[in-house]
Amino acid sequence: MPKLVIHQEKVEDPQVLVDICPFGAMEEKDGKLSINAACKMCKLCVKKGPAGAVEYVEDEKKEEIDKSQWNGIAVYVDHVDGEIHPVTYELIGKARELASKINHPVYALFMGNNISDKAEELLHYGVDKVFVYDFPELARFKIESYTSVFEDFIKKHQPCAILTGATTVGRQLAPRVAARMKTGLTADCTILEMDENTDLSQIRPAFGGNIMAHILTPNNRPQMATVRYKVMNAPERTEETHGEIISCAIDKEKIKAHVDVLDIVKKEPEKFIESADVLVVAGRGIKKEEDLAMIRELAELLDGQVACTRPLAEAGWVEAKCQVGLSGRTVRPKPVSYTHLRAHETCADL
């Protein structure tokens, strides 16, 4: 990426540049200037600072990759002890749609221990190849081991794009893999579209849901995106299977971790609004926190759950995990009761 270079010999008074920067990114120590992480690359120091003191250096043009060498849309299989998270099936459905536009196969990456007998289920949803890494070392999620397996899969099979569920595991794993492969990652995508040249258009809300950002990774592979549960539609399960299951080998040294899982304490079962059939949604029209009591009473009468729009979550009146909309959770309840919403409030993901 581009960078700013300070030519110390041309800086007569460091304080001049310190004062120019509106973000406090210029630091002076022992008569020398440095740039910290607050820099926004606005280039004011280049334009208004002493001539030649700060230089903006563009990246050297990266050699274009051969996109034809990257083939297939891969889905990471999110599971706990072999029980596959439903977001996986939703992503398989989207992967099939994307793959059909460029005539690519659909892959599933399944890693864990004693999971081989669960892999066939994925074939009932239209996966062409399930790559299974079944080892005792992968019995519990360890970020080092899982990242190494992911890297091994990518280097051997070179998928064009990888879709991962935005779950607790997926949110940890996908960024590590993207950094390891030096590629881009778009989190919490709501729309995915495939171009004929195999570029994946990744669309997601930005700036609190006020705009939709369109993101491309044109000269890096694989292209990576995470998607929340219930954003995409899962395909129908079929009785027939046409794909194949491939047992993968890997050097045991690569999946050794420096962290051991000593014990697992399971949380008490918790209700999530994503799985609720009935929701009562409160918004900015609620003027006092005390007024939420009648909202909760209504939800209880309907055997449903309480949800809210962004203002109530930001006020701390309702937990953030109960927020719906572009900047909240994606839900698909049957009936939805909206109470006290202002005209400009929307729940676009409902």
Model-identified regions with their sequence ranges:
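Single conserved hydrophobic/aromatic residue that forms the stacking wall/gate
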Residues: H340-L350
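N-terminal glycine-rich FAD/FM-binding segment characteristic of electron-transfer flavoproteins
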Residues: M1-R342
